Amino acid sequence: TDNQKGLIDALESFDLNTQQLNNNQGRLQSTKTLNLSSNQIDNSTGHILANDTLILNSEQTNNTEGVIASVNADVQLKITALENNKGEISAQNVQLNGQTLNNHQGTIQSKVGDLTLKVDRIDNGNAQDSAGSLVAGKNLNITAQQLNSTGQIYAGDTADLTVKQLQQDGQL
């Protein structure tokens, strides 16, 4: 599906199943629930938005300088490899399951609720100029084999980190 520099605007709930989605500089949005499944997603400088729950399943997603967000509900992501460099992922609650997350200068944020990351390898910045932010309005739950961070990891309430290898040079 090619939505490069385009607009797909659903007035109701919207399901999109495609092999490949090019949403580079595009806008894919739903006034209700958005359910997106694709092997590869290019959301570079694009927007994937839902007023209600946003569910995204993908093997590879490039969200460089892009936005993936739900205004009034949750974002549930199952992505094998996520590039969120200078990108933003936000919702009331955010859940991410995957194998690799690169979050250089990116932000993943639950506005008022929980941020749950179950990712094998998390890179939240490897230098001060590439520091990312993982921010939970309430509870932060991270389960990972490896977590490298020069960025901010913040919980408004409790933080539960289950990590086998931690390199943290930023704020925790």
Predicted regions mapped to residue ranges:
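Short, T/G/N/S-enriched strand-turn elements that build extracellular solenoid repeat scaffolds
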Residues: 3-9, 23-29, 42-49, 63-69, ...
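Surface-exposed loop/turn motifs in large extracellular/passenger domains
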Residues: 10-18, 32-38, 50-58, 71-80, ...
